[in-house]
Each structure stands twice: as structure tokens, then as C-alpha cells.
């Protein structure tokens, strides 16, 4: 008589774990790597710009070379060229931060203005007081000769009044001229804006370079600016009105 040998029972298969729908969680090692590298690149770029500004203050644009900036930071010139295509671009972007702060300062000054003329008056006072309070920064922006660089090489958006201080001044001059009955063309707006810009730059640069000149007594700076701008506005509007009357005749 034969007896069947009982078959061995198969081990139960492990149950599959349910997988939730949606993307897999990020791998910390992978996700933080690029971000860390970006931060390092940003920090290194800022070190190069700071070094360029330091050299500008010491010896002007002629003191700024790719080699000199590399030596200041302790890197090779290849690293500098990796961020900036040439010396002109490097110097331009080294000064961009000052120009943006300056533009923001002017923009804040006109927020409480009650008229186009008041806006122009406020921005003129803000321009001069900023320059005289920050002479080193002002020298870098407007008194230190720099190699020309294409607009697209700047980090400032051309024509954006929040970053481009001249664009703000031009818009304010245009707003003032728009109060006149006669139509105003772009050439007239541009000429008036440049006259205003050169006027406030003139008083600022003189205050910075020779404010202690003993040969004449200067008016308090705000009083000086306000009087000057009122005369400018009166003369400009009179000239526009006279030109309109002549053209009608």
C-alpha cells in the first residue's frame, strides 16, 4: 500500500505595496546640487563685480583689467571671462547696482507729488541730495569715464523708469509738457529732458568737486535746486508757448 507524500506548501508571495499617484519625491542629493552651484556662481560673480568697483574707485577705468580683477579675487582670468565677455561689460555691470539704487531713490521721491511741475522739482532735489550724500557712488555713475558698452550688456532694462533714471526724468518732463495746449514732438521732449538732466548733474558734480570753494558763497543745496528748477520750468513753458504762438501766425 502506497501512501501519498504530502506536497510542501508554497511560501506566500509578499504583497505589493500600493504606490500613490503623483510624481516621486525629489532626491535631496540631486535637487540641492544645482541650486547650490547657482548660489556659488552668483556669489562668485558678485565678488568679481565688487573687485571691479574697488579698482574703479582706486584708479578709474584704466585700472580695471580682467587680470587685475582676477588677481583681486584670487581666480584665473578664464573665470572672469566666463562671467563677462569683455572689460566694458564688466565695468558696466559693476556700476549697474549703483544706477538701480539711484533710480529707485528718484522714483520714491515723486510718489507724493501733486502736479507734473512738483514731480520734476522733487526728482531734482532727490537727484542732487543723493549725489552729494553718496559722492563715491555718484562719481562711479556719472563722473568716471567708462568704455562704451552695448545697452543689452547692462542688467538695467532700458526705458524702465524703475531702473533707468534718465527714463524717469524724461517721462516727468514729457508729463510737464503735456499740460500745454500745443502738441509737443519727441525732439522737443528729448531736448528738454537732456537740458534738465545736464542741469541737475552740473550742480551735483560742482557740489561734489568744489563745495568748499572759498571764492564764492553757495546757497543751501535744496534752496539752490528748487530755485533753479522753477526758473527752468518757467523758461521752458514760456519757450514752448512762444513757439506755439509763432507757428500759429
Model-derived features with residue positions:
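Helix-turn-helix
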Residues: 47, 55-89, 93
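Short, flexible, mixed-charge acidic loops at enzyme active sites
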Residues: 26, 142-145, 208-212
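Hydrophobic alpha-helical connector segments
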Residues: 93, 107-137, 160-166, 186-196
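N-terminal intrinsically disordered/low-complexity leader segments
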Residues: 1-43, 54, 240-249
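Short amphipathic alpha-helical elements of helix-turn-helix/winged-helix folds
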Residues: 51-55, 130
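Generic hydrophobic, amphipathic alpha-helix propensity
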Residues: 41-52, 69, 94-98, 102, ...
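Hydrophobic/aromatic-rich alpha-helical bundle segments in the mid-to-C-terminal region
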Residues: 151-159, 163, 176-230, 239-249
